[in-house]
Amino acid sequence: IRRELFNSEELLALPALGESIELLGLLACYSAPAALFMPDGTLNPDLPRYLSEANTLNALWLKVSLGHFSDAQPLEALRTLLNASGMALVVENDQTDCGQLAPMQRFQTACRELALPVTLTFDMGNWLWVGDSPEEAARHLAPAVSYIHVKAAVPHKDNFRAVAPDRADARWLDLLGQLPADAPRGIEFPLEGADL
């Protein structure tokens, strides 16, 4: 469930949506279009609200981007928030400099050293947007990955365009094989025509 698709009135109806999800026996994850860390390296002050919304939806986890992680100092405060909420947190490599392999590795290493229960969303195509190798990212981050955004990326004008992995070269399907087989996968490419 993508928070950015809700207007303010619809956000007030999250409890009803959460009830429907539970009634229908569905599983959901909640994605907030926000960074975990602010430009000054502090935790996003809206994180408690996002965690609460995820709980209201009975989501399996809250997904955010990394943002400006600089050091481990705020991670104990993050632990406190996560323990209080009972919500799992996954952090995605986005299409900004903050989503590059080096900061993602630093964050993942800090979480591992502090035994902080935060895992990663591995967006397969986003690595190209930030100039990194998806395969190298998989080699370094796969053990921490708990959710995969499945998409391939092909050059398009001055950037890239997301496409289905089976519409691109074999590299993308090979990449999936380097990631945890038991990690849930979300579609992150356009569905068109016969794919619908």
Segment roles from a protein language model:
Residues I1-T56:
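N-terminal pre-domain/capping segments
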Residues D71, R79-D97:
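Catalytic cores of phosphodiester-bond-cleaving enzymes
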Residues G18-I21, L82, C111:
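Conserved hydrophobic residues forming the short capping helix/wall of the S-adenosyl-L-methionine
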